């Protein structure tokens, strides 16, 4: 085996010289080098997004072109409607003010906020009282335990004094500049709409200062019919009420961010000068890839798989994957402290996305470009700790954005692990990764830096998720850097599978066919032994190897596979003359993605895929399920189907069983799909269409928790608006 002239790895003919795939078996990584992942270019040479240009699909909150730093706010008439963020400084924002005699007067919210925050605040109790004064609905419900613990117990007296005498006044001054720094309406990035929003880092710091002080209206209630029930929370009150050591460390990260970006009264030199762009991508299902027809060779994907390192540290210049909750940020403003939450507190500018990003639907993703990192950390989950300042040296692009691109894609939550091998659900994960990884520029796409997406608390199988992401990268012609977070065995297993794909010329369609066969096998086993369902990770790879061996043993199949591997969907035609034998195609130009993005289609999801496909916002609020509920409903439908199959196999002679068999098989003996079964499940009244609390929410940990994870109940909530 030898290196090709373009730096790629030539086709594997023998198992000699394995050090060419890694410098040594002692190295933490396998596959190709990071230089190959970067296509033998400089790490930041390839761009993830085009330059900032204002237009109908891209709202820019600062003046273009940028003539001074930080950029000046763009001015346009304010809006107070359901398509824009309702700002606390808007003249329409009002709130009941309590008078000394016990009566109430409707007052301008911003005036109440100014009066409360401009008073001397010297203790944690006074800070809580100030925040409660313009959130009086929650006087008996908000108890800022974490904030009290941090300021009164965790920090020493000098640190606490500095907070109240220096940092808090700076945060307040920055927050009260909201009318000056945000002078045009902030659009909401809503369901089924492709839209981009660019803000200056200074504007983001102002918005986050307001979130720190809990000033945003209509964002505290938990009622299912509330206006923002499909949006993440943004005010910090839930974080202040949470418990656990990681909560205090997250607060330290956030306070450190404000130390870095809040100007003093006499010095504004620390004000950040860059910008950040948020892009919501929404795709049409009928234009997604037919994975059963993709001839893209899996072995052509340059793969670097590493047991050490992190996505944010080693994935510089690549598209970095956020293992997201569909409510952006997951539990970052609560108890959660896993991959997504950690990324959001070390790069707090990502938090502002929670203000305007509606929860992600199955064929949607959010790309965030330009967020700066401010903190170092150690540990994970309960062992997470803030470990000091981080100076981000990432270069900026021509628009002033740090060249750090992060894509938020949410995986399904599997209460029972065997459900994830269903064809319906594997295809959902493929399409979710596809809409996140697709590249819209004519230049070659940078590689993807990812890892065990949707595993851990969400119950995903890393062995399966790695294959699904490899399939998407093959389809799109993107190199793949995969981090196993210390799992050496999985690193070697995944790398070995990739080598097998290279040797056999295995294509996406061939692997998809094998995965579908495995799905049927698991389904058959679960029908016969519904209580066991021991779908082993290792068994999946063993099954794939056996199926590929069958292909090799059939005369003529090898030639067929070789012919199928002659093209990579998403890559240009022809090979470099100097690298005709190179398997990872590093220098090809990607073709235009095979997916259509629409501006404001109201019918992006077919009826059988969506229970909230109504034009009525009230109906959408009613039918919207939480993270856990949506997954639980799908898994329950899968269980019903499995149960139905058992009844059929038992050949019961009762009329009830006969009816069940008929319904399960449908007309012409066709087996119902999971999504059809789910629809039938709803129609029978077996599951309420009305939103409800998930019985499993309290059992989940980290990002698997519902965004509704709080310390109060819905029945105690009151509307926080009188607008």
Curated annotation (Swiss-Prot):
GO process annotations (BP): ATP generation from poly-ADP-D-ribose; Cajal body organization; carbohydrate metabolic process; DNA damage response; female germ-line stem cell population maintenance; heterochromatin formation; maintenance of protein location in nucleus; nucleotide-sugar metabolic process
Reactions the enzyme catalyzes: [(1''->2')-ADP-alpha-D-ribose](n) + H2O = [(1''->2')-ADP-alpha-D-ribose](n-1) + ADP-D-ribose
Pfam families according to UniProt: PARG_cat_C (PF05028), PARG_cat_N (PF20811)
Keywords on record: Hydrolase, Phosphoprotein
Record carries keyword Hydrolase: yes
Disrupted gene: phenotype observed: Progressive neurodegeneration. Knockdown of Parg leads to decreased survival when animals are exposed to stress with either hydrogen peroxide or environmental hypoxia.
Family membership noted in the UniProt record: Belongs to the poly(ADP-ribose) glycohydrolase family.
Record GO terms (molecular function): ADP-ribosylserine hydrolase activity; poly(ADP-ribose) glycohydrolase activity
Biased composition (Polar residues): 577-586, 609-619
Protein name: Poly(ADP-ribose) glycohydrolase
Top-level class of the enzyme under EC nomenclature: hydrolase
InterPro entries: PARG_cat_C, PARG_helical, Poly_GlycHdrlase
Compositionally skewed regions (Basic and acidic residues) per UniProt: 702-718
One GO CC annotation: nucleus
Region (Disordered): 1-23, 554-593, 609-723
Phosphoserine carried by residues: 24, 28, 579, 582-583
Protein EC: 3.2.1.143
Domain of life of the source: Eukaryota
Function (record text): Poly(ADP-ribose) synthesized after DNA damage is only present transiently and is rapidly degraded by poly(ADP-ribose) glycohydrolase. Poly(ADP-ribose) metabolism is required for maintenance of the normal function of neuronal cells.
Biased composition (Low complexity): 632-664
């Amino acid at each position: 085996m030898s290196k090709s002239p373009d730096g790629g790895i030539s086709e594997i003919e023998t198992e000699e010289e394995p050090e060419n795939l890694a410098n040594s078996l002692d190295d933490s990584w396998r596959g190709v080098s990071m230089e190959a992942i970067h296509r033998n270019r400089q790490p930041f040479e390839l761009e993830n997004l085009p330059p900032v240009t204002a237009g109908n699909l891209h709202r820019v909150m600062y003046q273009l072109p940028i003539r001074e730093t930080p950029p000046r706010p763009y001015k346009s008439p304010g809006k107070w409607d359901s398509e824009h963020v309702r700002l606390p400084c808007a003249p329409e924002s009002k709130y009941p003010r309590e008078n000394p005699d016990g009566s109430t007067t409707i007052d301008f919210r911003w005036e109440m906020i100014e009066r409360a925050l401009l008073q001397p605040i010297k203790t944690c109790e006074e800070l809580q009282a100030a925040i409660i004064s313009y959130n009086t609905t929650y006087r008996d419900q908000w108890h800022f335990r974490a904030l009290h613990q941090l300021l009164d117990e965790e920090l020493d007296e000098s640190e606490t004094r500095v907070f109240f005498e220096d940092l808090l006044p700076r945060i307040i001054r920055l927050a009260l500049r909201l009318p000056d720094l945000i002078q045009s309406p902030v659009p909401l990035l809503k369901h089924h709409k492709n839209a981009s929003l660019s803000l200056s880092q200074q504007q983001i710091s102002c918005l986050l200062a307001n979130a720190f002080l809990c000033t945003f209206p209509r964002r505290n209630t938990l009622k299912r019919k509330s206006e923002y029930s499909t949006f993440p929370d943004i005010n910090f009150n839930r974080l202040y009420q949470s418990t656990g050591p990681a909560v205090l460390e997250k607060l330290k990260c956030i306070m450190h961010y404000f130390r870095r970006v809040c100007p003093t009264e006499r010095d504004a030199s620390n004000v950040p000068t860059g910008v950040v762009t948020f892009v919501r991508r929404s795709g049409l299902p009928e234009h997604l890839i037919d994975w059963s027809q993709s001839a893209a060779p899996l072995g052509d994907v340059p793969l670097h798989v590493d047991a050490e390192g992190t996505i944010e540290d080693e994935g510089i210049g690549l598209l970095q994957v956020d293992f997201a909750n569909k409510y952006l940020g997951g539990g970052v403003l609560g108890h959660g402290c896993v991959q997504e939450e950690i990324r959001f507190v070390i790069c707090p500018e990502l938090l502002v996305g929670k203000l305007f990003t509606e929860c992600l639907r199955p064929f949607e993703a959010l790309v965030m470009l330009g967020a700066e990192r401010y903190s170092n950390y150690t540990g994970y989950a309960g062992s997470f700790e803030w470990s000091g300042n981080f100076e981000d040296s990432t270069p900026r692009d021509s628009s002033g954005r740090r060249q750090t691109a992060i894509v938020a894609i949410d995986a399904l939550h599997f209460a029972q692990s065997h459900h994830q091998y269903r064809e319906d659900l594997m295809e959902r994960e493929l399409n979710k990764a596809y809409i996140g990884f697709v590249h819209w520029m004519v230049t070659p796409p940078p590689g993807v830096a990812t890892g065990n997406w949707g595993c851990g608390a969400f119950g995903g199988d890393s062995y399966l998720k790695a294959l699904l992401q490899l399939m998407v990268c093959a389809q799109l012609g993107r190199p793949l850097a995969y981090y196993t977070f210390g799992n050496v065995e999985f690193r070697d297993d995944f790398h070995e599978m990739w080598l097998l794909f290279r040797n056999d010329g295995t294509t996406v369609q061939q692997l998809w066919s094998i995965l579908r066969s495995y799905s049927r096998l698991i389904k058959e086993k679960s029908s016969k032994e519904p209580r066991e369902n021991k779908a082993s990770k290792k068994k999946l790879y063993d099954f794939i190897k056996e199926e590929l061996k069958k292909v090799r043993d059939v005369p003529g199949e090898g030639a067929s596979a070789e012919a199928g591997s002659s093209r990579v969907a998403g890559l240009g035609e022809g090979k470099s003359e100097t690298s005709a034998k190179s398997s990872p195609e590093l220098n090809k130009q990607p073709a235009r993605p095979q997916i259509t993005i629409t501006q404001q289609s109201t019918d992006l999801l077919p009826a059988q895929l969506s229970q909230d496909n109504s034009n009525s916002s009230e109906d959408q609020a009613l039918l919207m399920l939480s993270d856990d509920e949506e997954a639980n409903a799908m898994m329950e439908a899968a269980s019903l189907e499995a149960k139905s199959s058992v009844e059929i196999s038992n050949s019961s002679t009762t009329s009830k069983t006969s009816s069940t068999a008929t319904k399960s098989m449908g007309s012409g003996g066709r087996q119902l799909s999971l999504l059809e079964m789910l629809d039938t499940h709803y129609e029978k009244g077996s599951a309420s269409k009305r939103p409800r609390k998930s019985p499993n929410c309290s059992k989940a940990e980290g990002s698997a928790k519902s965004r509704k994870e709080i310390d109060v109940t819905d029945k105690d909530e009151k509307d926080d608006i009188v607008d």
